[in-house]
Design a protein with these regions (language model features):
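A glycine-rich beta-turn/hairpin centered on an aromatic-Pro dipeptide
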Residues: 163, 173-184
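A residue-level signal for beta-strand positions that form part of recognition/binding surfaces
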Residues: 58, 175, 200
Length: 233
């Protein structure tokens, strides 16, 4: 709904934009009212009313930048209830793992500012799944799916860096924001020659600062880790 509002504004439809923002606020409140819950002492979300077990899809509010219960949700996602050496369980009630929810969860953890926890999970996942003995693709539900490949989910891995670590979020056809959450284990992170928003730009993060430059090297924006910069191309 918020992205619909941005699109409507770009198209000059302020009435629809306002309606979408109002509906988004109502939905935000409903998510907290219906799904907000304390499970195992952690302030997070329940999958539905009456369910008192953790499920990995509690990560979705973080991916949608709803951080009301970010700390409790981060604790739940990285707890022994859900996280295993070989991946993330879909539910604490069974031993089925699915990389799709794992990749969403890591992206959400970065976006919520829990970058060091997220990076530990990301590094273990990358070494085990993508650089291990198997073909480098995310896998479907295991053991019930027999580790069938989910090749399309490779895009979710990329989104961890773009939307999670760098926090790139569209604000218009030629505008976007950058909110870097770089883990302490990385001394720098650079993405060069990004083609998006009608232009070409690069992002370099090091020494606690993130610098956005255009194709010619001119500085477009600078921000500290955890802060937000608005970029117009």
């Amino acid at each position: 709904l918020l992205y619909c509002a941005i699109l409507a504004e770009e198209l000059g439809d302020s009435e629809t934009a306002a309606l979408c923002r109002t509906e988004a606020a109502v939905l935000h409140q409903a998510i907290e009212r219906v799904f907000g819950a304390s499970i195992h002492g952690m302030e997070t979300y329940r999958y539905h009313e009456g369910l008192d077990e953790l499920r990995s899809w509690i990560c979705m509010p973080l991916c949608m930048r709803i951080f009301d219960r970010a700390d409790g949700t981060a604790a739940a996602l990285t707890s022994s209830y859900l996280l295993r050496a070989d991946g993330m369980l879909t539910s604490e009630a069974n031993e089925t793992m699915w990389d799709r929810s794992m990749l969403y969860a890591v992206r959400g953890l970065f976006a919520a500012g829990h970058m060091d926890e997220a990076f530990r999970v990301l590094r273990a996942y990358s070494e085990n799944r993508l650089l291990g003995e198997r073909v480098p693709y995310p896998v479907e539900a295991y053991p019930e799916g027999g580790k069938r490949h989910l090749s399309g989910e490779s895009a979710l891995y990329c989104k961890i860096f773009v939307e999670g670590m760098l926090g790139i979020e569209p604000l218009g056809f030629r505008r976007f924001s950058v909110t870097p959450h770089i883990p302490s284990a990385l001394d720098h992170l650079t993405l060069s020659h990004i083609h998006a928003h009608g232009g070409v730009f690069s992002i370099d993060c090091r020494g606690g600062k993130c610098t956005v430059t255009d194709a010619g090297g001119a500085v477009l924006a600078v921000c500290s880790y955890g802060e937000t910069a608005i970029v117009t191309l």
